Design a protein with these regions (language model features):
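Active-site-adjacent structural elements that line small-molecule/cofactor binding pockets in enzymes
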Residues: 1-309
Length: 309
């Protein structure tokens, strides 16, 4: 069983991020993940001035100070960067990390940061269309042994090489963010390598909910003639380990979190994670860790992750 953590790139400092990454690299953690936002979500006007580091830059720096952790984003917003550029950045950081990079990408949802920085924010349908096309383009570059030509409705490649190619073989894995049943999981079945059920999105995060989403993915894989076992099933679960009922309530209310969150005493959090593992989750990423200190991540390592040794 593998465990990761989503480490915040906003409301904190680089020294805090690097300290946490260093401790994680020495512990039980298998992976480190970063959100991709240019303003701190969920978009409160009074918080827009707070720190929000650019996520790919942070990850590149973390690659240089760690030696073991796999790393990626949960998830990059497709509308922020040209997908050809994303593929190039991905292959570069895969070499910096000696093959530890995972490309996590989604259609993007945060309208306010598009407005703030002058990026177009298309309709949901167009964002899904663009996202599917971007996944096709990126995968095409990842798997090709020669320059790639691609002509879509939104993106074009003209005899474009990907050099350096992926450091890891057979190629950098693609994590498709989101579990929308009609479009996103279908895109994952065709172009992705990793599914991630996102507790931030408001689902109940029960074993039954997880298995339902896997069932939908399996049907899409059948439609494309793909073996669903080729796709790794993962979960992002916001969590807080605390015996203090007031702290738990404040955590849930302050972040507007619901059923997708495991907040409570240690054994409750362990049981919630264990149920997802029994349902077939192959990796659990813990998100929403409110205290960005090495000691807190070490505490979760020793008190929660150790239960699954």
């Amino acid at each position: 069983m593998k465990f990761g953590a989503q480490v915040g790139v906003y409301r904190n400092t680089w020294d805090e991020i690097s300290g946490v990454a260093t401790v994680m690299d020495k512990g039980r953690w298998d992976s480190i993940w970063f959100a991709d936002h240019f303003l701190p979500p969920p978009g409160r006007p009074e918080e827009e001035h707070l720190t929000a580091h650019e996520a790919f830059t942070v990850l590149s720096a973390v690659a240089g100070i760690t030696s073991r952790l796999r790393m990626g984003h949960l998830v990059l917003g497709n509308t922020y960067r040209n997908p050809g550029l994303v593929a190039k950045m991905a292959s570069t950081v895969d070499h910096i990390s000696h093959g530890r990079f995972v490309l996590g990408i989604g259609a993007a949802w945060f309208k306010r940061e598009h407005e703030a920085y002058g990026w177009e924010f298309p309709s949901m349908k167009e964002r899904q269309d663009r996202f599917e096309e971007a996944c096709a383009l990126i995968r095409g570059l990842f798997v090709a042994d020669e320059p790639v030509n691609f002509k879509g409705n939104y993106y074009v490649l003209d005899n474009a090489p990907l050099s350096p190619a992926s450091f890891q073989g057979p190629h950098i894995p693609i994590l498709v963010g989101g579990t929308g049943e009609q479009r996103t999981l279908r895109t994952l079945a065709r172009y992705g390598d990793i599914m991630n059920l996102d507790g931030w999105a408001g689902g109940p995060m029960t074993a039954e909910y997880f298995q339902h989403k896997v069932g939908v993915l399996t049907k899409h894989c059948e439609d494309w003639g793909r073996d669903p076992s080729e796709i790794t099933k993962t979960v992002l679960m916001p969590a807080l380990v605390s015996d203090d009922a007031d702290e738990v309530e404040a955590f849930l209310k302050g972040r507007r979190l619901g059923e997708g969150t495991a907040a409570g005493p240690k054994n409750y959090v362990i049981d919630r994670i264990g149920a997802l593992i029994e349902a077939g989750a192959q990796e659990v990423m813990i998100g929403g860790i409110s205290t960005m200190t090495p000691d807190n991540f070490q505490f979760i390592d020793e008190e929660v992750l150790s239960a699954f040794d």
